C-alpha cells in the first residue's frame, strides 16, 4: 500500500500535470469505486477546473472549481497517470478524467480497492479515516509534547502504535519497520515504557526517514509507480524491510522477520532488544 512518501510523490506529479486543467468528461468503468453514484459523480465534475492537489496522510485531496473536493485513497494498488487520450484503455483503468488539453487523467487499480469520494469543499475531513486522522509527521505538527503524551498514555506495541493513523498520519508497514530500526526500538516494545531520549530519537527518525523517502520518490517493492509512470528508488536504501536473513547494516546480525499486528515485521534482534 502506498504510504506517505509515495502519496506525496504522486501529489507532486499530479499537481504539475493537471492543476489548471478543465475536466471535459468523466468515464467511470467501475461504479463501486466512486461516490456519489457514477452518473452524478461524472455530471458534477464535467466542466470543472482542477484547482489544487493536496495530501492528508495517505489520502489525495483534489480541489475543483464549484467548491468540490475529491478524496482519493489509493489503497493497495491504485495509480494515477496522465496519458494521450488516443491511447487505449488499460484493463484496469477504472476512472478516466478527460481533460481540455487532449489528455486523460486515468486511475488504474488492479485490485479495485481504491475509492473516490466527491464532497463539497470543506467537508473532506468527514470522509472515512480522515475523521480521526492524527497529525502530519512534520516538526510543526508532530510535537514532542504530543508524541510523549500519546505514548505514555497507551500500553501498545510500538509497531501497532506507528501504524495507527489516528496517532500519526501516513506511516505504514515499510516506514514503521525502518523508523523503529533507526531508533533501535523493538517492534513489540510497549509504548509507555519508552524513555524521554527514545521518544525524542523516534520523532527525529520519523522526520528523517520520510524526508529521505520523499526525496527518492518513494519505495517500489511491488507495483508502485508515480504519476509519470516511474518507480521510486528508496527500496535501494531500506535497512530492514524485506531484508530478512541479510546482515544488519549497523551490526551485522541477520535481520529477522516476525508477525506483529498481523503484518510481516522486520528488525535486528541485536540492535532492537525487547525490554
Curated annotation (Swiss-Prot):
Statement: the UniProt record of this protein carries the keyword Hydrolase: yes
Residue positions binding DNA: 92, 111, 154
Q: Reaction catalysed? A: Hydrolysis of DNA containing ring-opened 7-methylguanine residues, releasing 2,6-diamino-4-hydroxy-5-(N-methyl)formamidopyrimidine; 2'-deoxyribonucleotide-(2'-deoxyribose 5'-phosphate)-2'-deoxyribonucleotide-DNA = a 3'-end 2'-deoxyribonucleotide-(2,3-dehydro-2,3-deoxyribose 5'-phosphate)-DNA + a 5'-end 5'-phospho-2'-deoxyribonucleoside-DNA + H(+)
For this protein, what is the EC number?
A: 3.2.2.23, 4.2.99.18
Could you tell me which InterPro entries the record lists for this protein? DNA_glyclase/AP_lyase_DNA-bd (IPR015886), DNA_glyclase_Znf_dom_DNA_BS (IPR015887), Formamido-pyr_DNA_Glyclase (IPR020629), FPG_cat (IPR012319), MutM-like_N-ter (IPR035937), Ribosomal_uS13-like_H2TH (IPR010979), Znf_DNA_glyclase/AP_lyase (IPR000214), Znf_FPG/IleRS (IPR010663)
Q: Which residues cross the membrane?
A: none
Q: Which CDD domains match?
A: EcFpg-like_N
Domain of life, source organism: Bacteria
Q: Which GO terms describe its molecular function?
A: 8-oxo-7,8-dihydroguanine DNA N-glycosylase activity; class I DNA-(apurinic or apyrimidinic site) endonuclease activity; damaged DNA binding; zinc ion binding
Gene Ontology BP annotations: base-excision repair
Q: How does it assemble?
A: Monomer.
Q: What is this protein called?
A: Formamidopyrimidine-DNA glycosylase
Query: Which source organism?
Result: Pediococcus pentosaceus (strain ATCC 25745 / CCUG 21536 / LMG 10740 / 183-1w)
Q: Which gene encodes it?
A: mutM
Amino acid at each position: 500500500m502506498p504510504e506517505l512518501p509515495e502519496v506525496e510523490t504522486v501529489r507532486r506529479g499530479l499537481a504539475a500535470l493537471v492543476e489548471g486543467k478543465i475536466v471535459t468528461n468523466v468515464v467511470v468503468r467501475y461504479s463501486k469505486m466512486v461516490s456519489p453514484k457514477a452518473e452524478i459523480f461524472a455530471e458534477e465534475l464535467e466542466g470543472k477546473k482542477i484547482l489544487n492537489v493536496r495530501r492528508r496522510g495517505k489520502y489525495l485531496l483534489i480541489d475543483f472549481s464549484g467548491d468540490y473536493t475529491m478524496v482519493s485513497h489509493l489503497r493497495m494498488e491504485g495509480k494515477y497517470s496522465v496519458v494521450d487520450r488516443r491511447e487505449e484503455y488499460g484493463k484496469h483503468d477504472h476512472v478516466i478524467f478527460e481533460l481540455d488539453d487532449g489528455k486523460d487523467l486515468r486511475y488504474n487499480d488492479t485490485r479495485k480497492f481504491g475509492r473516490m469520494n466527491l464532497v463539497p469543499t470543506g467537508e473532506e475531513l468527514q470522509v472515512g479515516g480522515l475523521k480521526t486522522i492524527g497529525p502530519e509527521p512534520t516538526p510543526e505538527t508532530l510535537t514532542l509534547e504530543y508524541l510523549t503524551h500519546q505514548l505514555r498514555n497507551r500500553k501498545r506495541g510500538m509497531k501497532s502504535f506507528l501504524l495507527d493513523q489516528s496517532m500519526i498520519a501516513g506511516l505504514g508497514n515499510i516506514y514503521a519497520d525502518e523508523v523503529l530500526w533507526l531508533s533501535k526500538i523493538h517492534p513489540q516494545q510497549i509504548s509507555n515504557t519508552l524513555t524521554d531520549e527514545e521518544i525524542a530519537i523516534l520523532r527525529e527518525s520519523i522526520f528523517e526517514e520520510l524526508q529521505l523517502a520523499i526525496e527518492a520518490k518513494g519505495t517500489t517493492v511491488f507495483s508502485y509507480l508515480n504519476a509519470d509512470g516511474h518507480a521510486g528508488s528508496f527500496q535501494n536504501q531500506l535497512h530492514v524491510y524485506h531484508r530478512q536473513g541479510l546482515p544488519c547494516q549497523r551490526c551485522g546480525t541477520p535481520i529477522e522477520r516476525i508477525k506483529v499486528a498481523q503484518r510481516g515485521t522486520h528488525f535486528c534482534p541485536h540492535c532492537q532488544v525487547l525490554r
